[in-house]
């Protein structure tokens, strides 16, 4: 999969369009669009099996899906800080950023642990070397962990963002904050 992950570099070119896109849509909507791309990527990658063209397409879509949340997530934190200021509370950008970083570390640790548990439960034996033949259950788990399981988490993010309403109020809040 090393060569396949190079295709995510192609998706990085979409970052050039982000400033223009943010003039027409909110940060939340751009992240939601990325979630949709990742969900589609997960389906494509799961169905691809050993089809290199589909794997390349899925990896490009995956990159296009992960970039918005990676790059635009901090902007949501700034919107929350603006909201705090609008409510008369301290902005707390540092605290919000630290919580975000801490949550990322905890999430990565839990995700890595669960990957190990699921791979072990599927019959994967990593210490057998190149001579081992992986059981079908381990191959299926690898496919699931690379495709549908992350896509399901992006679907959860997409659902949660439906309840994020600051994007509709942020321009008015920022104007009020500047007037104070």
Show which residues each predicted segment covers.
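Membrane-embedded alpha-helical bundles of multi-pass transporters/translocases
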Residues: 1-180
């Amino acid at each position: 999969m090393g060569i396949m992950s190079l295709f995510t570099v192609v998706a990085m070119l979409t970052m050039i369009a982000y400033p223009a896109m943010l003039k027409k849509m909110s940060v939340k909507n751009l992240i939601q669009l990325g979630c949709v791309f990742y969900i589609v990527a997960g389906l494509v990658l799961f169905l691809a099996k050993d089809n290199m063209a589909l794997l390349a397409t899925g990896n490009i879509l995956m990159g296009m899906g992960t970039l918005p949340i990676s790059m635009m997530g901090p902007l949501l934190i700034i919107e929350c800080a603006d909201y705090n200021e609008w409510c008369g509370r301290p902005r707390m950008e540092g605290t919000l950023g630290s919580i975000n970083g801490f949550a990322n570390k905890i999430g990565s640790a839990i995700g890595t642990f669960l990957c190990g548990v699921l791979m072990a439960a599927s019959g994967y034996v990593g210490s057998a070397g190149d001579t081992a033949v992986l059981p079908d259950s381990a191959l299926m788990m690898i496919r699931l962990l690379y495709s549908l399981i992350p896509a399901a988490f992006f679907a959860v993010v997409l659902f949660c963002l439906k309840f994020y309403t600051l994007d509709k109020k942020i321009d008015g809040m920022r104007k009020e904050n500047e007037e104070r």
